Amino acid sequence: MLRKKPPGRLLSKTAHKVEREYRIIHALAKTDVPVPKAYCLCEDDSVVGTPFYIMEFLDGRIFEDPVIPNVLPDHRRAVWADAVRTLAKLHRVDPRSVGLEAFGQPTGFYNRQVATWRSICDAQSAVRDVDTHEAVGPLPHFADLMSFFADESQQPADRGTLIHGDFKIDNLVFHKTEPRVIGILEYVHVLPSSPPPSLSNKKKPSWEMSTIGNPLSDISNLVTPYFTARLDPSRSVNVHPGFRPRATRGLPTPDDIFALYFSVADAAPPSNNTPSSPSSLELTLRTAAAADPRDRARELQWAQAFNIFRLAAICQGIAARLAGRQASSEQARRHGEARTGLAEFAWELVQSARSSSGGGVGKDGSKL
């Protein structure tokens, strides 16, 4: 299949970076991370109008619903288990060993994230409705949230690994019959009808959000449905009752996921992925392996709180688009209104992280 940059001037300098996508997919082919084969990259605009690359077509299943309905509990459990193992394999890839040492900054990921989202939220809150002139306004507890997240003494240990940026079940392609990941994708756009459970034009192998960053950002994104399931559906979006404790047979708990993830991420990577001297990645993984489990639990709580805050900020952005009449659908309205409940929930998680003694999250349900 061919993936090309859209014609014309792009609003975002980082969007549709097909050259970057090719680079990481091609590099990961040397590892045990399941990615499609990238055959060639053409940066000559005269061929098809914009740069493009050609890659392998993945013929498999995509589960739009992360609960994975209509399968047996054992299959559901195995699907989630391989997704978790796949993420851990990605995170244990040393960027130097595959030529991606310049793919992003190796330190300071969460500090940059906090600064970026503070700036974005400030701009979004100042947007005024074109008719009422009422400002969108800040998120609840915004100043306190920013103060907490910016406090380096509260942040997780600074780590730098390859991260996907939007890792979740519906961004993966699974084997047609086996509970096995055959490729990592990224959600690009939504079609109005439901496609069959195979790779369609609803999913394209984009890695636009990938960089070098803290691996906790990916693992917290993967388990987000477990946390948002606690919310009132009338005040939020994407509240999936199937992720409530014991609601779905075969679905792992967050603790199950964390345990499997760290068991794989902390293991030594394959020999062809290990440089001659220890990298910062290897050292941080070794440090994580030896860390007090209570510290690890605290870091996971911090990362989840930040991820929920980020969702609130995204919904605030949709509210700003509504105010400027750049969006008008009912779905957009619901997302815009969800910013309040998500920000309140992020604040609850922050308070829990502050007072936590390091206990795990979620003890109910089946084991991987």
Question: Which residue ranges define each predicted feature?
Answer:
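Surface-exposed helix-capping loop/turn segments at secondary-structure junctions
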Residues: 31-35, 92-103, 126-131, 155-156, ...
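Generic alpha-helical structural context detector
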Residues: 53-56, 85-88, 115, 119, ...
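Catalytic-loop of the protein kinase fold
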Residues: 162-164, 169
